[in-house]
């Protein structure tokens, strides 16, 4: 049997939340049996995208160059998000895993659009809630998950939660089942 490593990040989770998580019917058994990193010292700036890239690289933002969730675009009312893997300036766990001939998957992990994961459902959305996400998601996701995306894109409601989380949950489960 192949060994597998699963990295789960729950945005804004703090160590004080873990006892409650252990009581949950689905997440509880996973949390109880998992290796955990508790009481970490956050990077600065403590924003979702820089934090998640630091987890993937082991580097601070001054090295990996993802310093904010969005690009700095002066006088732009809605700046572009830092979605694209190509903007990370150092190697990530994906690069090291591929060099070791391991298969990889990511499901809505920040800054993974266009990532070299074998199975990648990127955290990305269309410009507005009215826009069809198919084109941008097709560019951002790995080709191997095209069918999974098509089956689940009706769950994707722009960047809204809980719909976005529901989309990620279904895509992740199907990646595990299929591959």
Where are these regions (language model features)?
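N-terminal secretory/membrane-targeting segments
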Residues: 1-3, 20, 162-168
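Loop/turn elements at helix/coil->beta-strand transitions in domains of secreted/extracellular proteins
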Residues: 1-5, 34, 100-104
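Beta-strand elements within well-structured catalytic alpha/beta cores of enzymes
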Residues: 2-16, 29-30, 55, 97, ...
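Glycine-/proline-rich flexible loop or hinge segments
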Residues: 10-12, 37-38, 48-51, 70-82
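Short N-terminal binding/cap micro-motifs at the start of the first secondary-structure element
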Residues: 14-19, 115
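Short, structured active-site-proximal loop/turn typified by the sulfatase FGly-forming signature C/S-X-P-X-R
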Residues: 18-54, 58-62, 105
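His/Asp/Glu-rich, glycine-adjacent segments
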Residues: 59-179
């Amino acid at each position: 049997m192949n060994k597998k490593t699963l990295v789960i990040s729950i945005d804004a989770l703090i160590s004080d939340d873990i006892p409650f998580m252990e009581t949950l019917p689905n997440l509880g058994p996973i949390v109880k049996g998992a290796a955990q990193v508790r009481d970490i010292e956050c990077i600065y700036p403590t924003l979702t995208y820089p934090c998640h890239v630091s987890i993937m690289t082991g580097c601070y933002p001054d090295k990996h160059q993802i310093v904010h969730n969005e690009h700095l675009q002066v006088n732009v009312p809605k700046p572009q998000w830092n979605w694209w893997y190509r903007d990370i300036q150092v190697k990530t766990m994906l690069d090291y895993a591929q060099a070791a001939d391991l298969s990889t998957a990511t499901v809505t992990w920040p800054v993974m659009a266009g990532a070299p994961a074998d199975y990648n459902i990127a955290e990305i959305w269309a410009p507005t809630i009215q826009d069809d996400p198919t084109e941008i998601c097709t560019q951002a996701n790995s080709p191997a998950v095209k069918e999974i995306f098509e089956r689940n894109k009706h769950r994707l409601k722009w960047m809204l939660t809980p719909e976005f989380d529901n989309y990620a949950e279904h895509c992740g489960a199907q990646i595990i089942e299929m591959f």
